[in-house]
Swiss-Prot record:
InterPro entries reported in the protein's UniProt record: CD2 (IPR015632), CD2/SLAM_rcpt (IPR015631), Ig-like_dom_sf (IPR036179), Ig-like_fold (IPR013783), Ig_C2-set (IPR008424), Ig_V-set (IPR013106)
Pfam families, sorted: C2-set (PF05790), V-set (PF07686)
The organism's taxonomic lineage, starting at the top: Eukaryota, Metazoa, Chordata, Craniata, Vertebrata
Domain Ig-like C2-type: 122-202
Positions of the UniProt region annotated as CD58 binding region 2: 100-114
Transmembrane segments: 204-229
Name recorded for this polypeptide: T-cell surface antigen CD2
Keywords: Cell adhesion, Cell membrane, Disulfide bond, Glycoprotein, Immunoglobulin domain, Membrane, Repeat, Signal, Transmembrane, Transmembrane helix
Length: 344
């Protein structure tokens, strides 16, 4: 019974000893697009080290052996004097993985064995900060980077920390500037902003002022349009009146002026319009006696003769011609012994 107990005890001890002999894992971070050097943690090259071997996915990629040239699977790799492995090519995401390093002494014993977990990360970009005053909300965002953490500070106080590309925060005061920081194992970027927002009362007055200004502008525009329409209406009415005046003048000119009567024509018309006296009627002028019949006949013929026209008067040259004198006959009731003078 005692033997069984001792056997089980030694078995457990041996298992625990094997577990303690397991290889340690070390994480090494690389930058996307850049080379990397894999250093051996807690190791220093000494004269009793004979060999350093680097293996990736079961394949020997590089080997350092004392008194022999180093073995390199390609020119991409290089073993340094301290035993570190240098990868010269720009690292890509698919270059992430586990690299195993084994160190042997001159006696052939294993001095060290470690697994290095290589992870390739993208550097973070500079954060951006924007805010909205009506909502009192601030947003911090990062566009590029992998496996980073976003942190927001106000002054020296950490407000929030999240492993995501954007983060929002609703502030209660603006006593200190805000700082947004993005960080991952291979890079770190930050940005600081001072947020300025008008107070609510001021924004209310600004809104009221803008509204009143807009209303006043609308009224001024309406008044301007009204004045323009009124002026156009007045000009149109004035043009209509001018057209009416021009039309009346044109009709008057087309009718022509009435002919003015000359004194000679007026006298002729008056003579022509006078009705001849009835037969047997004799005109008597006060203070004169009636003329004899022969004289009346000659005088009546002279009265009927039309006066010369204005054209004939202007065409006649020289002094006017003398008219024959007519001697009046003595009245019938005069004495028989009175003799008439001889005619000229």
């Amino acid at each position: 019974m005692k033997c069984k107990f001792l056997g089980s005890f030694f078995l457990l001890f041996s298992l625990s000893g094997k577990g303690a002999d397991c290889r340690d894992n070390e994480t090494i971070w690389g930058v996307l697009g850049h080379g990397i050097t894999l250093n051996i943690p807690n190791f220093q090259m000494t004269d009793d080290i004979d060999e350093v071997r680097w293996v990736r996915r079961g394949t020997l990629v590089a080997e350092f052996k004392r008194k022999k040239p180093p073995f390199l699977i390609s020119e991409t790799y290089e073993v340094l004097a301290n035993g570190s492995l240098k990868i010269k090519k720009p690292m890509m995401r698919n270059d992430s993985g586990t690299y195993n390093v084994m160190v042997y002494g001159t006696n052939g014993m294993t001095r060290l064995e470690k697994d290095l977990d290589v992870r390739i990360l993208e550097r973070v970009s500079k954060p951006m900060i924007h805010w909205e005053c009506p909502n009192t909300t601030l947003t911090c965002a990062v566009l590029q980077g992998t496996d980073f953490e976003l942190k927001l500070y106000q002054g020296e106080t950490l407000l929030n920390s999240l492993p995501q590309k954007n983060m929002s925060y609703q502030w209660t005061n603006l006593n200190a500037p805000f700082k947004c920081e993005a960080i991952n194992p291979v890079s770190k970027e930050s940005k600081m902003e001072v947020v300025n927002c008008p107070e609510k009362g001021l924004s209310f007055y600004v809104t009221v002022g803008v509204g009143a200004g807009g209303l006043l502008l609308v009224l001024l525009v309406a008044l301007f349009i009204f004045c323009i329409c009124k002026r156009r209406k007045r000009n149109r009415r004035r043009k209509d009146e001018e057209l009416e005046i021009k039309a009346s003048r044109t009709s008057t000119v087309e009718r022509g002026p009435k002919p003015h009567s000359t004194p000679a024509a007026a006298a002729q018309n008056s003579v022509a319009l006078q009705a001849p006296p009835p037969p047997g009627h004799h005109l008597q002028t006060p203070g004169h006696r009636p003329l004899p019949p022969g004289h009346r006949t000659r005088e009546h013929q002279q009265k009927k003769r039309p006066p010369p026209s204005g054209t004939q008067i202007h065409q006649q040259k020289g002094p006017p011609l003398p008219r024959p004198r007519v001697q009046p006959k003595p009245p019938c009731g005069s004495g028989d012994g009175v003799s008439l003078p001889p005619p000229n």
